[in-house]
Amino acid sequence: MNRLLIIITFLSSFSALGQDSLSLKKAIEIGLQKNFDIQLTQKNVAINQIMNSWGEAGSLPQININVGQNNSISDQRNNPISFAPYLFQSSDVSGNLALNWTIFNGFGIQANKNKLEQLQIQSENTATLAIENTIHGIILSYYQAKMQKEQLNLIFNLIQLSKEKYDQQVLKSNLGVGVKFELLQYENNLLADSSSFYLQELAFQNSIRNLNLLMGADIEKEWILSSEIKPELNDKDFNTLKNEMLANNTNIKNQFLNISLNQQDISIAKSSFYPNINLNAGTNTSTGKLRTNDANAPIQAASNRNLNYYANFTLNFRLFDGGKVRRAIKALEIQNEMNQTQLEQMQQQLILELSNTFALYQTRKKIFELNKKAFIASKENLEIARFKEKTGLINSFNFRDIEMNYLSSGVNLYQSSFDLLESNATLLKLTGKIIQD
Protein backbone atom coordinates (compact mmCIF):
# COMPACT_ATOMS: atom_id res chain seq x y z
CA MET A 1 0.00 0.00 0.00
CA ASN A 2 2.83 2.38 0.83
CA ARG A 3 4.48 1.53 -2.47
CA LEU A 4 1.29 2.47 -4.32
CA LEU A 5 1.13 5.87 -2.65
CA ILE A 6 4.82 6.48 -3.34
CA ILE A 7 4.24 5.82 -7.05
CA ILE A 8 1.24 8.15 -7.18
CA THR A 9 3.09 10.84 -5.22
CA PHE A 10 6.01 10.55 -7.60
CA LEU A 11 3.73 10.93 -10.62
CA SER A 12 2.01 13.93 -9.11
CA SER A 13 5.08 15.72 -7.74
CA PHE A 14 7.77 15.00 -10.30
CA SER A 15 5.87 14.81 -13.58
CA ALA A 16 6.48 18.53 -13.97
CA LEU A 17 10.24 18.06 -14.25
CA GLY A 18 11.50 18.98 -17.71
CA GLN A 19 8.17 20.48 -18.73
CA ASP A 20 7.72 23.98 -20.12
CA SER A 21 5.21 26.43 -18.72
CA LEU A 22 2.31 27.19 -21.05
CA SER A 23 -0.13 30.04 -20.57
CA LEU A 24 -3.29 30.41 -22.62
CA LYS A 25 -1.79 33.42 -24.41
CA LYS A 26 1.33 31.46 -25.32
CA ALA A 27 -0.76 28.50 -26.50
CA ILE A 28 -2.69 30.79 -28.85
CA GLU A 29 0.55 32.35 -30.14
CA ILE A 30 2.00 28.90 -30.90
CA GLY A 31 -1.23 27.85 -32.59
CA LEU A 32 -1.33 30.94 -34.80
CA GLN A 33 2.20 30.15 -35.99
CA LYS A 34 1.97 26.37 -36.42
CA ASN A 35 -1.67 25.38 -36.90
CA PHE A 36 -2.02 23.52 -40.20
CA ASP A 37 -5.39 25.01 -41.19
CA ILE A 38 -4.03 28.54 -40.74
CA GLN A 39 -0.94 27.74 -42.80
CA LEU A 40 -3.08 26.39 -45.65
CA THR A 41 -5.41 29.39 -45.71
CA GLN A 42 -2.44 31.79 -45.64
CA LYS A 43 -1.01 30.03 -48.70
CA ASN A 44 -4.36 30.52 -50.41
CA VAL A 45 -4.27 34.23 -49.54
CA ALA A 46 -0.80 34.47 -51.09
CA ILE A 47 -2.09 32.85 -54.29
CA ASN A 48 -4.99 35.31 -54.56
CA GLN A 49 -2.67 38.25 -53.90
CA ILE A 50 -0.51 37.13 -56.82
CA MET A 51 -3.52 36.70 -59.09
CA ASN A 52 -5.02 40.08 -58.19
CA SER A 53 -3.37 42.17 -60.93
CA TRP A 54 -4.40 44.19 -63.97
CA GLY A 55 -2.47 41.77 -66.14
CA GLU A 56 -4.60 38.85 -64.94
CA ALA A 57 -7.73 40.94 -65.52
CA GLY A 58 -6.74 41.43 -69.19
CA SER A 59 -5.83 45.11 -69.10
CA LEU A 60 -2.23 44.80 -70.28
CA PRO A 61 -1.08 43.91 -73.79
CA GLN A 62 0.50 40.65 -74.83
CA ILE A 63 3.87 40.89 -76.58
CA ASN A 64 5.32 37.92 -78.44
CA ILE A 65 8.55 37.50 -80.33
CA ASN A 66 9.24 34.80 -82.91
CA VAL A 67 12.55 33.99 -84.61
CA GLY A 68 13.06 31.42 -87.38
CA GLN A 69 15.94 30.18 -89.53
CA ASN A 70 15.35 28.31 -92.82
CA ASN A 71 17.72 26.52 -95.19
CA SER A 72 16.98 25.06 -98.63
CA ILE A 73 18.63 23.68 -101.79
CA SER A 74 17.03 24.19 -105.22
CA ASP A 75 18.39 22.14 -108.13
CA GLN A 76 17.26 23.68 -111.44
CA ARG A 77 19.91 22.08 -113.64
CA ASN A 78 17.54 19.55 -115.20
CA ASN A 79 14.65 21.98 -115.53
CA PRO A 80 14.43 22.92 -119.25
CA ILE A 81 12.11 25.83 -118.66
CA SER A 82 14.17 27.42 -115.88
CA PHE A 83 15.80 30.76 -116.69
CA ALA A 84 18.54 29.91 -114.18
CA PRO A 85 19.46 26.23 -114.60
CA TYR A 86 21.83 26.12 -111.67
CA LEU A 87 22.10 24.52 -108.20
CA PHE A 88 21.15 27.15 -105.60
CA GLN A 89 21.65 27.13 -101.81
CA SER A 90 19.57 29.57 -99.80
CA SER A 91 19.31 30.49 -96.12
CA ASP A 92 17.33 33.15 -94.31
CA VAL A 93 16.61 34.39 -90.80
CA SER A 94 13.23 35.93 -89.97
CA GLY A 95 11.88 37.60 -86.87
CA ASN A 96 8.54 38.92 -85.71
CA LEU A 97 7.59 41.17 -82.79
CA ALA A 98 3.82 41.27 -82.22
CA LEU A 99 1.67 43.21 -79.77
CA ASN A 100 -1.94 42.23 -79.07
CA TRP A 101 -3.94 44.58 -76.86
CA THR A 102 -7.60 44.56 -75.95
CA ILE A 103 -8.41 48.25 -75.70
CA PHE A 104 -12.08 47.84 -74.81
CA ASN A 105 -14.23 44.80 -74.12
CA GLY A 106 -17.41 46.25 -72.71
CA PHE A 107 -16.05 47.07 -69.21
CA GLY A 108 -15.21 43.38 -68.73
CA ILE A 109 -11.62 44.20 -67.73
CA GLN A 110 -12.75 46.38 -64.83
CA ALA A 111 -15.27 43.74 -63.78
CA ASN A 112 -12.55 41.08 -63.85
CA LYS A 113 -10.28 43.25 -61.69
CA ASN A 114 -13.06 43.87 -59.19
CA LYS A 115 -13.70 40.13 -59.00
CA LEU A 116 -10.02 39.40 -58.38
CA GLU A 117 -9.97 41.95 -55.55
CA GLN A 118 -13.04 40.38 -53.99
CA LEU A 119 -11.55 36.89 -54.32
CA GLN A 120 -8.51 38.13 -52.43
CA ILE A 121 -10.72 39.60 -49.69
CA GLN A 122 -12.69 36.36 -49.56
CA SER A 123 -9.49 34.34 -49.09
CA GLU A 124 -8.44 36.74 -46.32
CA ASN A 125 -11.82 36.27 -44.63
CA THR A 126 -11.41 32.51 -44.93
CA ALA A 127 -8.01 32.86 -43.25
CA THR A 128 -9.66 34.97 -40.55
CA LEU A 129 -12.28 32.26 -40.04
CA ALA A 130 -9.52 29.65 -39.69
CA ILE A 131 -7.82 31.85 -37.10
CA GLU A 132 -11.09 32.31 -35.19
CA ASN A 133 -11.75 28.56 -35.21
CA THR A 134 -8.20 27.86 -34.07
CA ILE A 135 -8.31 30.37 -31.22
CA HIS A 136 -11.73 29.08 -30.15
CA GLY A 137 -10.49 25.48 -30.28
CA ILE A 138 -7.29 26.25 -28.36
CA ILE A 139 -9.21 28.11 -25.64
CA LEU A 140 -11.56 25.18 -25.12
CA SER A 141 -8.79 22.56 -25.33
CA TYR A 142 -6.58 24.51 -22.93
CA TYR A 143 -9.28 24.89 -20.29
CA GLN A 144 -10.39 21.30 -20.84
CA ALA A 145 -6.85 20.14 -20.04
CA LYS A 146 -6.68 22.53 -17.08
CA MET A 147 -9.98 21.19 -15.77
CA GLN A 148 -8.72 17.61 -16.05
CA LYS A 149 -5.57 18.62 -14.14
CA GLU A 150 -7.55 20.26 -11.34
CA GLN A 151 -9.76 17.20 -11.03
CA LEU A 152 -6.60 15.09 -10.86
CA ASN A 153 -5.40 17.27 -7.97
CA LEU A 154 -8.71 16.77 -6.18
CA ILE A 155 -8.37 13.00 -6.41
CA PHE A 156 -4.76 13.20 -5.23
CA ASN A 157 -5.91 15.16 -2.16
CA LEU A 158 -8.43 12.42 -1.43
CA ILE A 159 -5.71 9.78 -1.78
CA GLN A 160 -3.57 11.58 0.77
CA LEU A 161 -6.53 11.84 3.13
CA SER A 162 -7.44 8.18 2.62
CA LYS A 163 -3.80 7.21 3.25
CA GLU A 164 -3.79 9.23 6.44
CA LYS A 165 -6.92 7.46 7.70
CA TYR A 166 -5.60 4.09 6.61
CA ASP A 167 -2.31 4.63 8.49
CA GLN A 168 -4.25 5.61 11.60
CA GLN A 169 -6.25 2.38 11.45
CA VAL A 170 -3.08 0.34 10.90
CA LEU A 171 -1.57 1.97 14.00
CA LYS A 172 -4.71 1.23 16.02
CA SER A 173 -4.66 -2.38 14.85
CA ASN A 174 -1.02 -2.73 15.85
CA LEU A 175 -1.90 -1.37 19.29
CA GLY A 176 -4.81 -3.78 19.55
CA VAL A 177 -7.51 -1.11 19.70
CA GLY A 178 -8.43 -1.03 16.02
CA VAL A 179 -11.41 -2.56 14.28
CA LYS A 180 -10.71 -4.85 11.34
CA PHE A 181 -13.84 -3.65 9.57
CA GLU A 182 -12.70 -0.02 9.70
CA LEU A 183 -9.23 -0.96 8.45
CA LEU A 184 -10.66 -2.78 5.44
CA GLN A 185 -13.02 0.09 4.72
CA TYR A 186 -10.21 2.66 4.58
CA GLU A 187 -8.03 0.30 2.56
CA ASN A 188 -10.85 -0.10 0.05
CA ASN A 189 -11.27 3.68 -0.11
CA LEU A 190 -7.56 4.13 -0.79
CA LEU A 191 -7.56 1.55 -3.58
CA ALA A 192 -10.67 3.05 -5.18
CA ASP A 193 -9.18 6.55 -5.07
CA SER A 194 -5.92 5.27 -6.57
CA SER A 195 -7.80 3.64 -9.44
CA SER A 196 -9.65 6.91 -10.07
CA PHE A 197 -6.32 8.73 -10.08
CA TYR A 198 -4.91 6.60 -12.90
CA LEU A 199 -8.04 7.03 -15.01
CA GLN A 200 -8.07 10.76 -14.42
CA GLU A 201 -4.37 10.99 -15.26
CA LEU A 202 -5.09 9.31 -18.61
CA ALA A 203 -7.90 11.81 -19.29
CA PHE A 204 -5.50 14.67 -18.54
CA GLN A 205 -2.80 13.28 -20.85
CA ASN A 206 -5.30 12.83 -23.68
CA SER A 207 -6.50 16.41 -23.26
CA ILE A 208 -2.89 17.64 -23.53
CA ARG A 209 -2.47 15.66 -26.75
CA ASN A 210 -5.60 17.26 -28.19
CA LEU A 211 -4.25 20.69 -27.26
CA ASN A 212 -0.91 19.92 -28.94
CA LEU A 213 -2.70 18.87 -32.12
CA LEU A 214 -4.55 22.18 -32.33
CA MET A 215 -1.38 24.16 -31.62
CA GLY A 216 0.60 22.23 -34.24
CA ALA A 217 3.06 21.13 -31.53
CA ASP A 218 4.56 17.69 -30.93
CA ILE A 219 1.70 15.42 -29.87
CA GLU A 220 3.62 13.99 -26.89
CA LYS A 221 4.88 17.38 -25.67
CA GLU A 222 4.11 17.89 -21.97
CA TRP A 223 3.22 21.24 -20.46
CA ILE A 224 2.67 22.94 -17.14
CA LEU A 225 -0.57 24.87 -17.64
CA SER A 226 -0.06 28.19 -15.87
CA SER A 227 -3.33 30.01 -16.62
CA GLU A 228 -6.06 29.51 -14.05
CA ILE A 229 -9.69 28.66 -14.69
CA LYS A 230 -11.25 31.98 -13.73
CA PRO A 231 -14.46 32.79 -15.57
CA GLU A 232 -15.26 36.47 -15.97
CA LEU A 233 -18.80 37.07 -14.81
CA ASN A 234 -19.46 40.05 -17.07
CA ASP A 235 -22.97 41.27 -17.72
CA LYS A 236 -23.79 41.06 -21.42
CA ASP A 237 -26.58 42.72 -23.39
CA PHE A 238 -28.20 40.57 -26.06
CA ASN A 239 -29.05 43.43 -28.43
CA THR A 240 -25.47 44.70 -28.30
CA LEU A 241 -24.17 41.21 -29.05
CA LYS A 242 -26.67 40.85 -31.90
CA ASN A 243 -25.59 44.11 -33.54
CA GLU A 244 -21.92 43.19 -33.17
CA MET A 245 -22.55 39.79 -34.73
CA LEU A 246 -24.44 41.17 -37.74
CA ALA A 247 -21.64 43.68 -38.34
CA ASN A 248 -18.56 41.56 -37.63
CA ASN A 249 -19.37 37.86 -38.04
CA THR A 250 -16.97 36.40 -40.60
CA ASN A 251 -19.51 34.00 -42.10
CA ILE A 252 -21.88 36.89 -42.81
CA LYS A 253 -19.03 38.88 -44.37
CA ASN A 254 -18.22 35.96 -46.64
CA GLN A 255 -21.83 35.69 -47.74
CA PHE A 256 -21.88 39.39 -48.66
CA LEU A 257 -18.76 38.72 -50.72
CA ASN A 258 -20.49 35.82 -52.47
CA ILE A 259 -23.27 38.21 -53.46
CA SER A 260 -20.76 40.77 -54.70
CA LEU A 261 -18.86 38.12 -56.69
CA ASN A 262 -22.08 37.03 -58.34
CA GLN A 263 -22.81 40.64 -59.31
CA GLN A 264 -19.36 40.87 -60.89
CA ASP A 265 -20.10 37.72 -62.88
CA ILE A 266 -23.24 39.45 -64.16
CA SER A 267 -21.16 42.50 -65.18
CA ILE A 268 -18.67 40.25 -66.98
CA ALA A 269 -21.49 38.49 -68.84
CA LYS A 270 -23.11 41.81 -69.83
CA SER A 271 -19.82 42.99 -71.33
CA SER A 272 -20.56 40.63 -74.25
CA PHE A 273 -23.26 43.08 -75.40
CA TYR A 274 -20.59 45.72 -76.07
CA PRO A 275 -18.11 45.77 -78.97
CA ASN A 276 -14.54 44.61 -78.51
CA ILE A 277 -11.75 46.82 -79.82
CA ASN A 278 -8.34 45.23 -80.27
CA LEU A 279 -5.00 46.55 -81.44
CA ASN A 280 -2.53 44.33 -83.28
CA ALA A 281 0.83 45.95 -83.94
CA GLY A 282 4.32 44.78 -84.60
CA THR A 283 7.21 44.44 -86.98
CA ASN A 284 8.49 41.72 -89.32
CA THR A 285 12.06 41.45 -90.50
CA SER A 286 13.94 38.89 -92.56
CA THR A 287 17.44 38.50 -93.95
CA GLY A 288 18.27 35.95 -96.67
CA LYS A 289 21.17 34.80 -98.83
CA LEU A 290 21.14 32.90 -102.14
CA ARG A 291 24.34 31.41 -103.63
CA THR A 292 25.54 28.91 -106.25
CA ASN A 293 28.87 27.28 -107.02
CA ASP A 294 28.21 27.05 -110.77
CA ALA A 295 30.87 29.02 -112.65
CA ASN A 296 28.49 29.70 -115.53
CA ALA A 297 26.00 31.54 -113.30
CA PRO A 298 26.00 35.28 -113.93
CA ILE A 299 25.70 35.97 -110.18
CA GLN A 300 27.43 33.75 -107.62
CA ALA A 301 25.63 35.13 -104.55
CA ALA A 302 22.83 37.51 -103.64
CA SER A 303 21.29 38.71 -100.37
CA ASN A 304 18.10 40.48 -99.35
CA ARG A 305 16.64 42.15 -96.27
CA ASN A 306 13.04 43.12 -95.50
CA LEU A 307 11.63 45.22 -92.66
CA ASN A 308 7.90 45.85 -92.22
CA TYR A 309 5.81 47.59 -89.59
CA TYR A 310 2.10 47.23 -89.04
CA ALA A 311 -0.66 48.49 -86.74
CA ASN A 312 -4.20 47.19 -87.13
CA PHE A 313 -7.40 47.86 -85.25
CA THR A 314 -10.27 45.39 -85.14
CA LEU A 315 -13.78 45.87 -83.87
CA ASN A 316 -15.82 42.82 -82.98
CA PHE A 317 -19.51 43.04 -82.17
CA ARG A 318 -21.63 40.01 -81.43
CA LEU A 319 -24.97 40.34 -83.20
CA PHE A 320 -26.56 37.03 -82.29
CA ASP A 321 -25.55 33.95 -80.31
CA GLY A 322 -28.87 32.17 -79.94
CA GLY A 323 -29.64 33.91 -76.64
CA LYS A 324 -26.76 32.17 -74.85
CA VAL A 325 -25.50 35.27 -73.03
CA ARG A 326 -28.98 36.40 -72.02
CA ARG A 327 -29.73 32.98 -70.56
CA ALA A 328 -26.46 33.04 -68.65
CA ILE A 329 -27.27 36.49 -67.25
CA LYS A 330 -30.75 35.39 -66.23
CA ALA A 331 -29.29 32.35 -64.45
CA LEU A 332 -26.81 34.58 -62.63
CA GLU A 333 -29.59 36.95 -61.57
CA ILE A 334 -31.53 34.02 -60.12
CA GLN A 335 -28.35 32.89 -58.37
CA ASN A 336 -28.04 36.38 -56.93
CA GLU A 337 -31.55 36.10 -55.51
CA MET A 338 -30.60 32.74 -54.03
CA ASN A 339 -27.52 34.29 -52.41
CA GLN A 340 -29.70 37.02 -50.89
CA THR A 341 -32.06 34.39 -49.50
CA GLN A 342 -29.12 32.40 -48.12
CA LEU A 343 -27.83 35.56 -46.43
CA GLU A 344 -31.17 36.12 -44.72
CA GLN A 345 -31.29 32.46 -43.72
CA MET A 346 -27.74 32.62 -42.35
CA GLN A 347 -28.51 35.74 -40.35
CA GLN A 348 -31.58 34.13 -38.80
CA GLN A 349 -29.67 30.95 -37.98
CA LEU A 350 -26.85 32.91 -36.38
CA ILE A 351 -29.31 35.02 -34.39
CA LEU A 352 -30.89 31.79 -33.13
CA GLU A 353 -27.46 30.37 -32.25
CA LEU A 354 -26.54 33.62 -30.50
CA SER A 355 -29.81 33.62 -28.57
CA ASN A 356 -29.31 30.02 -27.42
CA THR A 357 -25.67 30.64 -26.50
CA PHE A 358 -26.55 33.82 -24.62
CA ALA A 359 -29.29 32.04 -22.66
CA LEU A 360 -26.89 29.19 -21.91
CA TYR A 361 -24.27 31.68 -20.74
CA GLN A 362 -26.74 33.30 -18.35
CA THR A 363 -27.78 29.91 -16.97
CA ARG A 364 -24.20 28.74 -16.58
CA LYS A 365 -23.37 31.90 -14.62
CA LYS A 366 -26.02 30.95 -12.07
CA ILE A 367 -24.87 27.32 -11.96
CA PHE A 368 -21.26 28.42 -11.47
CA GLU A 369 -22.17 30.61 -8.51
CA LEU A 370 -24.15 27.76 -6.93
CA ASN A 371 -21.37 25.22 -7.47
CA LYS A 372 -18.83 27.65 -6.07
CA LYS A 373 -20.81 27.98 -2.85
CA ALA A 374 -21.38 24.21 -2.75
CA PHE A 375 -17.66 23.50 -3.05
CA ILE A 376 -16.78 25.96 -0.28
CA ALA A 377 -19.39 24.33 1.95
CA SER A 378 -18.22 20.78 1.14
CA LYS A 379 -14.61 21.76 1.81
CA GLU A 380 -15.51 23.17 5.23
CA ASN A 381 -17.64 20.12 5.91
CA LEU A 382 -14.70 17.84 5.10
CA GLU A 383 -12.49 19.66 7.59
CA ILE A 384 -15.15 19.28 10.27
CA ALA A 385 -15.61 15.62 9.37
CA ARG A 386 -11.88 14.94 9.75
CA PHE A 387 -12.07 16.18 13.35
CA LYS A 388 -15.28 14.27 14.10
CA GLU A 389 -13.89 11.06 12.61
CA LYS A 390 -10.79 11.31 14.81
CA THR A 391 -12.95 11.73 17.90
CA GLY A 392 -15.28 8.91 16.91
CA LEU A 393 -18.35 11.06 16.36
CA ILE A 394 -18.82 9.67 12.83
CA ASN A 395 -17.87 6.31 11.33
CA SER A 396 -15.93 5.50 8.14
CA PHE A 397 -19.10 5.31 6.04
CA ASN A 398 -20.17 8.80 7.05
CA PHE A 399 -16.70 10.13 6.42
CA ARG A 400 -16.55 8.48 3.00
CA ASP A 401 -19.85 10.05 2.01
CA ILE A 402 -18.47 13.46 2.95
CA GLU A 403 -15.29 12.76 0.95
CA MET A 404 -17.32 11.82 -2.12
CA ASN A 405 -19.44 14.93 -1.72
CA TYR A 406 -16.25 17.02 -1.63
CA LEU A 407 -14.96 15.33 -4.79
CA SER A 408 -18.29 15.67 -6.57
CA SER A 409 -18.69 19.34 -5.68
CA GLY A 410 -15.12 20.03 -6.82
CA VAL A 411 -15.69 18.29 -10.14
CA ASN A 412 -18.95 20.20 -10.59
CA LEU A 413 -17.22 23.50 -9.85
CA TYR A 414 -14.48 22.96 -12.42
CA GLN A 415 -16.96 21.65 -14.98
CA SER A 416 -19.22 24.67 -14.52
CA SER A 417 -16.16 26.95 -14.79
CA PHE A 418 -15.22 25.30 -18.08
CA ASP A 419 -18.81 25.49 -19.34
CA LEU A 420 -18.96 29.20 -18.58
CA LEU A 421 -15.65 29.83 -20.34
CA GLU A 422 -16.86 27.80 -23.33
CA SER A 423 -20.05 29.88 -23.63
CA ASN A 424 -18.08 33.12 -23.37
CA ALA A 425 -15.61 31.98 -26.06
CA THR A 426 -18.48 31.02 -28.36
CA LEU A 427 -20.11 34.43 -27.89
CA LEU A 428 -16.81 36.09 -28.79
CA LYS A 429 -16.51 33.94 -31.89
CA LEU A 430 -20.08 34.63 -33.03
CA THR A 431 -19.64 38.39 -32.62
CA GLY A 432 -16.29 38.39 -34.45
CA LYS A 433 -14.41 39.62 -31.38
CA ILE A 434 -12.45 36.50 -30.45
CA ILE A 435 -9.38 37.74 -32.35
CA GLN A 436 -9.59 41.18 -30.71
CA ASP A 437 -9.87 39.74 -27.20
Language model features: what each stretch is:
Residues I50, N133-L246, T357-L360, R364, ...:
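Periplasmic alpha-helical coiled-coil/stalk elements that build and connect Gram-negative outer-membrane
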Residues G18-G68, S74, G178-V179, I219-Q263, ...:
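Bacterial Sec-pathway N-terminal export signals of envelope proteins
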